[in-house]
Design a protein with these regions (language model features):
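Short, conserved catalytic-motif segment at the N-terminal edge
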Residues: 45-107, 129-131, 146-148, 194-204, ...
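Short, surface-exposed loop or secondary-structure junction motifs
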Residues: 87-93, 148-371, 399
Length: 660
């Protein structure tokens, strides 16, 4: 919405002091460590010649598209308030021979759309209708965020920095293959309300503060926008961001309006070793990622933020509001990238970027803004599960190395690091996962992030791709730099002073991990499942082999063997159905949880009764000397394994129907 000049002047004057005071309440600024931080070349002026820039980007993209088998992609670069480069690569629709055109082709940039939600929310902050530090429940009438941590409400600022402490979830409902399964925004928020598993992060990351990315939290922000403005989320975005910027080829509506359908790119997945077009993705939480837009439209949005809210005579934010939004709002460590209000910080070659990534099951996107240089780089491909994380970063790194080079000081490990290296060793798990639903079980499919000391007095981090899978050297207490590049990570400690958390994985402040408790070690549980499965098989075989003899003996001894055998059949059936469900979810990522899973959970619940019954027979079997001593030991061990298996199911939320 365009502001008249006198209203703009009034807001700038009246809000300037408030924004300045708010900024003082923020976290410390990014602090370099001069001896190990990149030293930018001060004479660098960035890209100047569009033709030279196009030739360079062509070389990088051609190699990347070929290496990563991407079907189509686009790159848009802006500088000094104008598009310097906008190029398409490959196909938007390979089956019909339609090439990617950044001026006409709509891509689905996923979570990059969150930046529009945060910008809209910032507009309401400017208007005095929303306070950054107010309890979000102040603006909600249809639902409320639980008061899990009394005296520590979730604030608007927490939503914008992903520091509210919500658990995460997505499988079976976040991205759908049909609008028939879409729910009304309020209904969706209520049905999929996550638990608050951490207190809101306030900056004390050495005492357990954790930031964790939340799609649900962003959709909640979309509801606040609608409630406060009196408009639907879509109407507000269209009237107050799209129209002032002239973004006529962008929409959050699902499916896209008829006027845009013919220009929408197809998304591709790797199915059986071949890239195949996939159905349109419907997003349950539109404010978190249902955007469809051309590269040209994204360029207009980038330019507006690069110019602190201004675009061709219009404004989407005041200068003061934009500066507040772009400033550091949360930081886990002064030497690490922090979070702005909606954006993330990144530092490459000693320069600060405001960034956001976007992933759907079909599209991968990077939004990068060198805010001090007035330069933006947008990159997107329509081939998910192909374009790797490291490949996506290579374009930005190549661009920065060419146009904003820096000298990276060599770094030497401290001589005494070996004395404390063991403090960091262990396995860590991303804190962005479900804690209360069956989705937690998917954490068992990964061994987590492994941190191992090396003979070189460094740490080797493995178990995750991209820039993390390298060696890291200590440059400050609990703070590490990659040996061959400038990314930084850090560890934080619990109240007992023990290393408990790994911060800024992939240079993102919302990507944090905690040390995996011994009771949740995936290897332990897989070993237990294997042993229990063997026990279940033995129980079934024992029942069948001794059926005739037990029938002649009759009585409780026979009932004990039947109980254990049925327990084995039921739990083995559960394991088979659970495995088939995982395969089904892998092959149909947009579908709901398969009914096979519900059947399996039902069989496992029935098995609990037989497990309890079998456990009750153990002391009786020993007291009355049923069977041989070997058979009694075997029976007892099977029951112990069965009980341990139930504990494992409980640990991973597989006991009962804990579906989202």
């Amino acid at each position: 919405m365009r502001l008249t000049s006198h209203v703009a002047r009034f807001l700038a004057g009246s809000l300037g002091l408030a924004f300045a005071l708010s900024s003082l309440a923020g976290t410390d600024a990014y602090q370099t460590i001069p001896s190990v931080s990149p030293q930018p070349e001060q004479t660098s002026v960035g890209p100047q010649d569009p033709a030279e820039l196009a030739a360079f980007i062509d070389g990088v993209m051609t190699a990347q598209m070929r290496a990563q088998q991407a079907v189509g992609g686009m790159v848009v670069i802006v500088k000094d308030g104008a598009i310097l480069l906008a190029k398409g690569y490959g196909d938007a629709d390979r089956e019909n021979g339609r090439a990617v055109d950044p001026y006409t082709t709509l891509f689905r940039p996923g979570s990059v759309g969150k930046l529009f939600t945060w910008t809209a929310l910032m507009q309401l902050v400017e208007q005095g209708k929303v306070s950054l530090d107010a309890d979000v429940n102040t603006y909600l009438t249809q639902l409320s965020v639980p008061d899990t941590y009394p005296g520590q409400p979730v604030t608007v600022r927490n939503l914008m920095t992903h520091s509210a402490g919500f658990e995460d979830g997505s499988v079976g409902y976040l991205i759908l293959d049909s609008d028939a399964r879409l729910l009304d925004p309020v209904e969706a928020l209520i049905r999929y309300t996550p638990q608050r598993v951490h207190a809101p992060a306030g900056g004390d990351f050495n005492n357990g503060d954790m930031a964790s990315y939340s799609n649900w939290g962003t959709e909640l922000a979309g509801l606040i926008i609608a409630n406060v403005s009196g408009l639907s989320y879509n109407d507000y975005i269209e009237q107050n961001i799209f129209q002032p910027l002239g973004m006529a080829s962008s929409t959050f509506r699902q499916p896209v309006p008829d006027r845009l359908k013919e220009r929408l790119a197809s998304g591709y997945n790797n199915k059986g070793g071949r890239l195949k077009p996939q159905p349109y993705e419907f997003v349950m939480f539109p404010a978190a990622g249902s955007l469809s837009a051309t590269g040209e439209d994204i360029a207009k949005f980038m330019i507006a933020h690069a110019q602190n809210g201004a675009y061709q005579g219009n404004r989407i934010l005041s200068d003061a509001g934009a500066r507040l939004m772009h400033g550091r709002a949360l930081s886990p460590n002064p030497h690490l990238n922090g979070a702005a209000l909606g954006f993330y910080e990144n530092h490459v070659n000693g320069r600060r970027l405001l960034v956001h990534a976007g992933n759907t099951t079909q599209f991968q996107t990077e939004f990068n803004l060198l805010i001090d240089e007035g330069v933006g780089l947008f990159f997107s491909v329509n081939s998910e599960s192909i374009f790797s994380f490291s490949a996506r970063k290579e374009l930005l790194n190549a661009f920065m190395d060419r146009y904003y080079p820096a000298t990276l000081p060599a770094v030497q490990p401290p001589d005494d690091f070996a004395e404390r290296a063991a403090d960091y060793a262990g396995s860590y798990r991303f804190n962005r996962h479900s804690y209360s639903t069956i989705e937690k079980a998917f954490s068992m499919l990964s061994s987590g992030i492994s941190v191992t000391p090396t003979p070189h007095n460094t740490l080797r981090i493995s178990g995750v791709g991209g820039p993390l899978a390298k060696e890291w050297v200590e440059v400050a207490p609990d703070t590490f730099r990659r040996v061959d590049d400038d990314p930084m990570i850090a560890f934080s400690r619990d109240e007992q002073g023990q290393v408990a958390y790994l911060l800024n994985i992939g240079s993102l402040p919302s990507m944090q991990a905690y040390r995996i408790p011994s009771a949740e070690n995936p290897q332990l549980h897989w070993l237990l499942w294997a042993a229990a499965s063997l026990g279940f098989v033995v129980a079934v075989i024992s029942l069948l082999r001794n059926w005739g003899r037990d029938k002649r003996q009759g009585g409780l001894a026979r009932l004990a063997r039947i109980s254990a055998g049925l327990m084995g059949v039921l739990q083995l059936s559960f394991l088979v159905l659970f495995g088939l469900s995982i395969v089904a979810l892998t092959n149909q990522p947009l579908g709901p949880y398969p009914e096979l899973l519900t059947w399996g959970l039902t069989l496992s619940l029935i098995a609990i009764g037989f497990t309890v019954l079998s456990a009750g027979f153990v002391p009786v079997a020993w007291y009355q000397r049923w069977w041989s001593g070997y058979e009694r030991c075997q029976y007892s061990l099977i029951v112990v394994l069965a009980v341990a298996f139930l504990w494992s199911l409980h640990t991973w939320n597989l006991m009962g129907y804990k579906l989202p």
